Amino acid sequence: MKGLPVLLWLCTAVCSSYPLHGSEEDAGMEVLQKYLENYYGLEKDVKQFTKKKDSSPVVKKIQEMQKFLGLKMTGKLDSNTMELMHKPRCGVPDVGGFSTFPGSPKWRKNHISYRIVNYTLDLPRESVDSAIERALKVWEEVTPLTFSRISEGEADIMISFAVEEHGDFIPFDGPGMVLAHAYAPGPGTNGDAHFDDDERWTDDVTGTNLFLVAAHELGHSLGLFHSANAEALMYPVYKSSTDLARFHLSQDDVDGIQSLYGPPTESPDVLVVPTKSNSLDPETLPMCSSALSFDAVSTLRGEVLFFKDRHFWRKSLRTPEPGFYLISSFWPSLPSNMDAAYEVTNRDTVFILKGNQIWAIRGHEELAGYPKSIHTLGLPETVQKIDAAISLKDQKKTYFFVEDKFWRFDEKKQSMDPEFPRKIAENFPGIGTKVDAVFEAFGFLYFFSGSSQLEFDPNAGKVTHILKSNSWFNC
């Protein structure tokens, strides 16, 4: 039997704490051996161990593994250790620098290209594109880094799906266990990320969530090693999240990536905060009030703006708490008590609606030629007010909600789609007939009605969570 001396010595050192029998014992020892070889640097041709258990190389490696993964350091193959070893994880080893690869490799530039070479069949292409884009955004939010996607040629980060042996001499192992692996920054295959296509990739909490795994692997592509902090994204063992909408990096992740690239710097693409005198005390409008509702909600360059009366909260992944400002401190001509707001990302423009008029802004700039009549969009004259609006980047469509109906606008053709309006209840079951605001995050749509918020999965076509409107404020 290949590796028999290793397995015999492993059993001598660690069997006593994990009662196994026959083939089960052999299987457990083989799992341990491979785990220590793959992730903790155990030599594959170990022929001699000292007879004293607490000084054997195997016991020391078990203790090293237990310490890193946050387990009790028994030096034995106990049930907690065995359970954790069977959980899905990243294929990158755990030994090395605490938060970065040895030598701290990093990209020597702040703008990095990526390319999605091929796609899994588990998800629509647009869902894969969105998951990768959001995963990179997680790191972009806390660094000076920016990312752009190319469709052909060699990118800094090449992203692909593969099974078993796939050309890098580190084969995948089929469903479960190793989910993906990635390489540190550098030329050639360095920086690339590979995903095991034998997994069942999803964009929700069933199966293996592509966004969460991609965010972890792309951390490696940027130079981060595994973290021993179980709360960190860079912890090696996969942890499913039931609240993808409020996902944020741990401080450990932020400290690690900023040790390589520094904190984010303000640029023309970032909304600059006004002077302190224009920033308000949130107690002016209690953001954690159970009765809080919003006039409109929109994204703006990766942030989320929550509008209420003359004010708005600005929520960014960079800060745990939202800022609170007067609308006029950013955009003096915009109306208060607006009806709806939405961002068209490929135009870098946010549109504000009140009554039968529409305004347009780009960062701090209020665009010339506005306000215009909402009827220039093709809405009928009978519509004098929009309740809520959202533009979906993948579809290049904008949805306008009016009472219990909605219209759909084609951003590419710049015209209303035929066969609209349609009933909200038929296309968004469970949402109800009153929509105050809506925006998209992490592949879900968030509909606001009064002080309530509904998380809607557009792929499943159903409501997945009922939340308070201010759940984004850590209340």
Curated annotation (Swiss-Prot):
Q: Where does Ca(2+) 1 bind?
A: D122, D197, E199
Q: Coding gene?
A: Mmp3
Keyword Cytoplasm in record: no
Carries keyword Disulfide bond?
yes
- Write out the GO MF terms: endopeptidase activity; metalloendopeptidase activity; metallopeptidase activity; peptidase activity; protein-containing complex binding; zinc ion binding
Q: What is its main location?
A: secreted
> Per the database entry, which stretches of residues form a coiled coil?
none
Q: What is this protein called?
A: Stromelysin-1
Effect recorded for E217G = Loss of autoproteolytic activation and catalytic activity
Proregion residues are: 18-97
PANTHER family listed in its UniProt record: MATRIX METALLOPROTEINASE (PTHR10201), STROMELYSIN-1 (PTHR10201:SF215)
